[in-house]
């Protein structure tokens, strides 16, 4: 296959591109700045063809045709944590994927769209509602598609993952009091392999919605404690203060902590069913803490989050 990976230089996209290339597929990488992107890519991916892609400009079907030329499958691994200038949630998460799906339907290409677990219609975060709007537009487009919803990702090179590891090292863990939801932490390398395997399967109704996660489902507090590997003082941050801080972080573009993520942490974000073992042909990698502790939580935690 010839596969275009949009966002192929990012935390998720790099893993997807590497897994596809390891399986013998021709990988093309869509990036905002191809020359700078080539320098950031690992050596194994530097010979990939790079194509310039600014999703905020690709909001009509015709704008996609040149970018998609010669590709069999398109993987959209682009997302923004916060809006910046022309890069708005509506354009990047909703309008651009809508136009991309229309272009894929027109050209008979398969679209694999990476979204997130826990999206709800009445969420109070534009970050979340724009992602849900994008999902719904893709599902209605007529294109052969798969929407992939991973849980929290662990691995090197991720802004959020690195930030959580840093927080875990603190002797005091400040955890929002309403962050009671469980998260099925998974390795980003497993996500890359799973998406590569998904691309090799025939597009069908069975694979239209794919939820992925690890086999354990800790709360945020449990995850931080296990990552630290030794006891830490836990301070429950009141709801009003956690929300205020999340909005301030959004305004200042400071840290990965956002109001959207706070909303997600309020409810379980676990796959139901979990397609990861089936796609990998094995059990997911264990997420091991610095102290050597492996999460071993009851399987009953892996349930459909309440709406």
Region spans (language model):
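Conserved beta-loop-beta element that borders a ligand/cofactor-binding pocket
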Residues: 115, 136-157, 166
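Mid/C-terminal beta-alpha module of Rossmann-like enzyme folds, strongest
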Residues: 198-257, 271-307
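N-terminal Rossmann NAD(P)H-binding glycine-rich loop of SDR-like oxidoreductase domains
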Residues: 3-25
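Alpha-helical membrane-targeting segments
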Residues: 162-188, 231-271
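Substrate-positioning beta->alpha
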Residues: 159-160, 177-200, 207-211
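NAD(P)H-binding glycine-rich loop region in Rossmannoid oxidoreductase-like domains
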Residues: 35, 44-98, 103-105, 117-121
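Residues forming the Rossmann-fold NAD(P)(H) cofactor-binding site
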Residues: 13-15, 94, 132
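SDR active-site strand-loop-helix element
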Residues: 6, 30, 77-78, 111-116, ...
